[in-house]
Amino acid sequence: MTTTPSALKTSSLVLPTQVADGIWKKTVDGSVLARLAKRRPQKFGEVKQMTLTGTPRAELVGEGENKGPSEIGFGDKTVVPRKLQVTVRVTDEVRWADADYKLGVWDEIEDANAKALARALDLIGIHKINPLTGNVATTISEGVIDCDNTVTLAGGKYDEALESAIGLVLANGYAPDGIALDPMYSYSIAMMRDNDNRKLYPEMGFGQGEVSFNGLKGLTGTTVSGKPEIAAASNLLAIAGYWDAFRWGVQREIRAELIEYGDPDGLGDLKRKNQVAIRSEIVYGVGIMDLDAFALGDGAGIGDAGIGQVDVEEPADESDVRA
């Protein structure tokens, strides 16, 4: 059931005589795309990126021989501006409580808004969804999720599926330089063991944050699967890719704006309701140069085993045991 957002009230806060600095919050991971793909400077508006569609070849020329032509082709892809915003309301009483008790409410709201906008880059760039509703946005025509290179994760063979995804990127002529993983999928790989209970991938640690899979950089984040924002489960648990093919930049950014008048979000006049609003906005420029630079790990085939349920497989003989 959809609920109407309401303003933050002092009843939601703890106001003892002495309050420890800061407010505890659940850590929300940011954007995996922003960490894997290089941010590029952009001006506002659509940005045309030239792409090479034909690769010239060198010709061996003998003494006195004529030189032949080499073919080359160019195309273009468009980086499209995507505007996102977060608007939250608080009551006047919250402002007073924050001033008196030094709760750090304003800093916390600004930080939470920034994290929401960071996650939004992945949610539009990978899943093409409106983060607020969780539904696919009709205004976004292309996302990483549209990639046709897909490997189905089956049973407990999490590592083999990821290796296959990396192989698909290589087969398309790209050198994969990173992987994005759902945290529980990464954890499942990290917990894989041989029949002597030795970890197969000790470099994965517990599979959280920044990891390494056979020397390839990996980053974990819940935005890979789209949870919790996405309305319809995507089953996406891993992305292998050559990340220069995902182009993004920040065209305009408003860190935090205090709004004291009007009706900025359709919930009624602020002064009439004794409220203020805090709004954060950003305009991303987002474009994918070639979907073939990516491969997806689809968790639809995992079945009853489930992510996190790692079985230890007996090798055929001792030579099959990985140290």
Task: List the predicted regions and their residue ranges.
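Protruding loop/beta-arch "assembly-hinge" segments enriched in small, turn-prone residues
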Residues: M1-V28, D265-A323
